[in-house]
Amino acid sequence: MPRKNYICNLKPVFNPPKNEKKRSNFIDYAMKKASEIDVARSKLNYTLLAIDPKTGNILPRFRRLNEHRACAMRAIVLAMLYYWNTNSNLVEASIEKLSDECGLSTFSNSGNKSITRASRLITDFMEPMGFIKCKRKKTQSSSNYIPKKIFLTSNFFMLFHISQSTINQYLSEQKQSIKNLKKEKKIFISFSDIRVISKLDEKAARNKILNALIKYYSASELTKIGPQGLKKKIDIEYSNLCKLYKKNNK
């Protein structure tokens, strides 16, 4: 293959899979930032020292980004963000998956897949530069590459100007939001047998829910909720119990 044609996809683009669950607002925000800024030409790519992840020593000879690798980086940064778990920092996708969805995988005439373009970008550039951390995964695969667990670092987010304090603020708000949601969705009535609900008329069931709510919330919380808010919670809990009863009696 002529040297000028050795790259199969000159302009790789991340194409997220269809019918995937919706990503968090923060991931949407981060992906938007990363798409608006040329992450491959960030000053960090020229000012950070490349470190050998195995020894911790500075790499004296280090290959910087050529245009083909820069194009690959622009695509794969978005893919990593898309699959990023905000709680563990883990990218929940293999290198092969990232390569496939960014259009970086190639096939030989015999049908063998190569993900070298993606794997070398990750192991030879992004990891030494400190944008990600990689851990080897134990596998029985006979492939000619080693799948890894990829974790995003604070330097990764600095590529598109998102600071660690911004991430921490989001995580704090997310934690509080989940806590509030669990509190809202909590079922206050525990029946030893779900069929007991069939023996209660609506008024009795609602009174039982009301008593449970009064026991659950403090006086100040009940004041803040107010009569209308309390009525709404009773409606929600009564509806949940009815659905639960119907589900178990199909």
Curated annotation (Swiss-Prot):
Coiled coil: none annotated. It comes from the Bacteria. Keywords: DNA replication, Plasmid, Plasmid copy control. It holds the Pfam family IncFII_repA. InterPro entries: Plasmid_replication_init_RepA. GO terms for biological process: DNA replication; plasmid maintenance. This protein is essential for plasmid replication; it is involved in copy control functions. Belongs to the IncFII RepA family. This is Probable replication-associated protein repA2. It comes from Buchnera aphidicola subsp. Schizaphis graminum (strain Sg). The gene is repA2.
